[in-house]
Amino acid sequence: ARRAGAVTNFGFIDPPDMKAVSDGFNELTELKAIGRKRGEVTLTHTGRQLARIPIDVRLGRMVIEAAKTGSPNLLAQVLVVVAFLSLQDPRERPDDKREDADRIHNRYADETSDFLTALNIWDRVFQADGDPSNNALRRICKTEYFSWLRMRQWKDLVSQLRQMCKELKFKVGDPLPASRPGLEIRQLPLNQQAAHSLCCAWDADGIHKSMLAGLLSMMGMQVVREPKASDFAGLTGSARARAMKRAQKQSKNDYQGARGTRFALFPASAVAKKTPSWVMSTELVETSRLWARYSAADPAWAEPLAGQLTRTTYAEPHWSGSRGSAVATARVLLYGLPIVQDRAVQWGRINPLEARDFLIRQGLVEGDIQQRFSYDDFVGKNRDILEDAADDASRTRQLADTVSDEDLFDFYNAVIPNDVTSVADLAKWWKSEHDRQPNLLDFDPAKVERLASSDSVSLDDYPDHWHTTGSDGQPIDLRLSYVYDPADPADGVTVHVPLKALSRITPDQFTWNVPGLLDELILSMIKALPKQ
């Protein structure tokens, strides 16, 4: 039925467990097999394709992804792996020959992926030396510790899947590796063939990317907890050393899975020796621990495959002068796992109002813009006005009567459009607006409304130099500087006396003050008078 949601209202004689139904819907949503249209759950195009593939839906999703994004040969390789995962493992380990079987099987083991290990086996048995007859296959299986029946089932299922893909109009090539071990290695006696010696070169990225489409909720992130010495307080000697070594090894084989699950890589997996930072697996088996089988290193391609299954959080929005825009750090979560961390994103796409505020306050008012654009001289001119105003405030000690950063911010905020959130946006808008109003962004302190009613202060009362006469009767010109900061030892007016003029002046010449500060001088002298 295309209206998949009808199952919840169907009159079953023996109704299924609703949790199982809910889990099924969640799985189909993850695989993009169902969607919502006008409030109803419906089958998607992918869902209708999955319905025609007679294998587990997760494995079917891998086939569809390979057909959609990969080459015909890649699809053929994925079909081999999917068929392998659909059946019982053909590798055998007789109780009396386990070590020998493990050594034989390790020749095929790929340390990065159990999926590629399956392809190595397929290539060696069915391709490298031609398609074997039944008798030849029996001899190979006996020597290689494979089950002849399962190998036949594997081959038959691959043939069936290839035919099914053709019916779905998928182009299927041949599962050939880019390269394989030479004949001289394959013809060596088995006891002379080293571990991993039969590994081929496959399109590992393409294979794993296709398979990840069906395993989004089967990923895991390594969580390393270094053992502490206090964990072994009750042990001594060699027992303590062995326990610490075992704990050290186990600490790296601990993974956080989807929705808070924890698991470890199955010890027999070749990947378990590498303990990669990220893995994906086709099944979880619970014994003494929750083990992951057939795990492979995650290539971190989950985000485009997951789509709406992800949740993105943002932190630390700030202005970036080098980028000319506000940026933030993005973290993308899939079933609680951070598949993307510390990605810089344009804050204007997330919060345009706040991004515009960053542009005006830190980019324009504070002048933190590293890019040049047409007619951008207003930025420096307006900054010069603020710096002059700050110097005037240091002289007059009247902060409220001079323009401030907030005044310039209010000016820009009133004239710059709301959709301008970056230097690039500003440059584009200003280039077209400049011809109509070339002085629009020129800041005029005289138009600041809050200063219109304030009493004007003459800067002539705060001169830059003091002219006096030296003890030798010659004129002396001394520079003056102003600081308005009660916590600064230089607060007030400072006379800069050159060393060569020091002997020509006397302390009595410094009982004066500049006209603008006479009121404060008189007030401080009155306060210094004795109370009685």
Model-derived regions: residue spans:
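Second RecA-like catalytic domain
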Residues: A1-R323, L353, D357, R383, ...
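A positional "C-terminalness" feature that preferentially activates on distal terminal regions of long
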Residues: M164, D174-D254, A268, P304-Q532
